Amino acid sequence: MLLLMTAIPAARPAAQQGPVFRAGVEFVNLGVTVTDRKGKLISDLTADDFEVLEDGRPQTVRFFASSASPAPELHLGLLLDISGSMEGRMRDAREAATHVLSSLDVARDEAAIFTFDTRLDEVQPFAKGVQTLPDSLSALTPFGATSLHDAIARTAERLAAREGLRRAVIVFTDGNDNASRLTPEEVSGIASAIDVPVYIVGIVAAIDNPASDISVVKVENSALAGALTNLATWTGGRVAIASTSADRSMLAREIVGELRHQYFITFESSGRPGWHPLAVRARGKDLTVRARSGYIAGQSRPSPQ
């Protein structure tokens, strides 16, 4: 998200409050996930541990927040593929989505549930305390073509209107798309510009995934590789295959944990209109840092409170 504001020094530490701004200058907010070589979340870094590059040039961090300040609420859009290619996989998709919902804090976190084939339908509006899927989803028969890319873009736009920093689209799909108007590159640009990471949970049968003896395997299913993996990565999210019940349970906890332990970094934009590539690094540390790949200047929206 972009903020048309100017930072004002505050009396309390940044870790205990959000940034204070006044109109005039455009600021950019980044959600950042950090893991070690084994994939373990790293949640004890400080602002000095990060380097932010815009257009290849270092930027000054104006505001920094970790997951410890304060306990963060999540805003999730769960997106279930109900197109014809999901025949025989809907039970697994429902199970994976239910695991995500059961990992949420009923008092703080909010979620909405969407389904799609060639159109997007909201079956559960955004609300706190959503722990189960609507009963209507149990009787659904997968049918029709698939507009996966379009559905992701529209769900990300719904998330952008929610107040709060920790937002994400979580997609449950086999990865096939045969009817979208948007390309994966266009979708990643939309989601990156509004700072909504996209997580894609690949619902594949064991026969589709020879490495299914590994808990959550690398993406080897062709429909989930390449452009779709790039789509998720460029937004700061990722793709993972869930071919067993244990996979689905573990992956749900991982995704919710990642979002809960994100860092948030705000820096001043260069102000030049157009697309600006971004990179975030951990100084002098052998860590993996995930954040959106860029933003579009001149498309600011109000800061979430």
Q: Predicted segment positions?
A:
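Scaffold/interface architecture of coatomer-like assemblies
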Residues: 11-305
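Bacterial N-terminal signal peptides
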Residues: 1-9
